[in-house]
Structures are given as structure tokens and as C-alpha cells.
Design a protein with these regions (language model features):
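Non-catalytic terminal extensions of ATP-dependent helicases
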Residues: 1-194
Length: 194
């Protein structure tokens, strides 16, 4: 694959860098004959990657974020002799869940912002962290596997999580994301026709 030729239509430098990383992972997967993964991509990057890969008819990849409606996903590039079923059996090799269980007095205190803020405050890269599923009693933080131990060790250094129980779980053990629906009635005046 000629990287420069494939990227010529993209103007933004960030887009080129993101797609260049994806091309590199796909090439490494082909030449080495093994699975390669990117860091987490945000929703824009996921959309960009999907359109780029479809346009260039590249099929040996899977976008995965830990659960069906995840916003942040990794791109898993695999050799031609692998199937998606073979990849699905190995998801736990790519992603882990760092589970934070709060104490009784801390339950309900923290939002997504608090968890993400803590990770950023520790100086850890956002690209290594996927979705953060927040619940009343804590959160499940999806991370790339090699990052799980680091996060488990560093989170208790933050005052807000010093009394929390922090464990590393398999990606299959992630809690279901709670979807809250609120009905709102809005009355809108319309212009009179008379």
C-alpha cells in the first residue's frame, strides 16, 4: 500500500496522522501474520476510519469498544486467514475493565467528568482509555489491556478514590450502560395565519 497515495485526499493533518497509524497497523498485521490493535479512536476517528477502509476495500479489521453502542473503539487489524469469530474469542486479550467500587459514603457523588478528570490528572493518555460506564456505586473504565495494571495502581493515589475498591475484570464482565429517558413536553406557539 502506498500510504501517500491513499492519504492524498485528506487535508487535515490530524486525519492524516490517524489514518497513517491505521494503515501501519494493517500493514504490520499482513506482514507479521498476527493481530494488531490501535489505541482508542473517538467517534469522529471511528467514522473517518470506516469510510477510509470501505473506500479502499480493506476488510480485515474490526472496530470494537467493549459493548455494542460504545463511543470509543479500537481498530483490530487481522491477517486474511483469521475470521471475525476468531477475533471475538480473543477480545479479552485486547481490552480490560478497571472497575471502581465506591464506599457507601461516596456512592452517587461522582459523574463521568470526575472519573475522566482523575485519569487526566494522573497524566495518563486519553487514547488508552475507552468508554467510562458510570453507575451509582462506581464505574467501569474500559482500557487497553497493557494499561489496566497502571490505572489500577495509580487511581488510589487520588483523594477521591483512595477508599474505593479497584479491580481488573475481563471485558465480558462490563456492567450494562444505564440509559435514562426523560419525557419533556414542549408547547411552542405558532404564528397566526389570520
Amino acid at each position: 500500500m502506498d500510504k501517500q497515495q491513499l492519504l492524498r485526499d485528506y487535508k487535515k493533518q490530524e486525519d492524516k496522522m490517524c489514518l497513517a497509524q491505521i494503515i501501519d497497523k494493517i500493514e504490520m498485521s499482513r506482514t507479521r501474520g498476527k493481530i494488531e490493535c490501535t489505541d482508542f479512536l473517538d467517534m469522529y476517528q471511528v467514522s473517518l476510519a470506516e469510510s477510509f477502509l470501505k473506500k479502499n476495500q480493506i476488510q480485515n479489521y474490526k472496530l470494537y469498544g467493549g459493548y455494542p453502542d460504545s463511543e470509543r473503539k479500537i481498530l483490530i487489524a487481522y491477517p486474511e486467514n483469521y475470521t471475525e469469530e476468531m477475533i471475538a474469542k480473543n477480545y479479552s486479550k485486547f481490552l480490560k475493565v478497571v472497575k471502581i467500587e465506591l464506599t457507601e459514603e461516596d456512592k452517587g457523588k461522582f459523574t463521568h467528568r470526575n472519573y475522566l478528570g482523575g485519569i487526566v490528572k494522573l497524566g495518563l493518555k486519553r487514547e488508552k482509555v475507552g468508554d467510562i460506564v458510570v453507575a451509582e456505586d462506581g464505574a467501569d473504565i474500559i482500557v487497553v489491556s497493557e494499561f489496566a495494571e497502571i490505572l489500577k495502581k495509580e487511581l488510589p493515589t487520588l483523594t477521591r478514590f483512595e477508599n474505593a475498591t479497584i479491580t481488573i475484570n475481563e471485558i465480558t464482565e462490563i456492567r450494562k450502560k444505564e440509559i435514562k429517558i426523560e419525557n419533556i413536553e414542549i408547547i411552542v406557539p405558532s404564528l397566526r395565519m389570520d
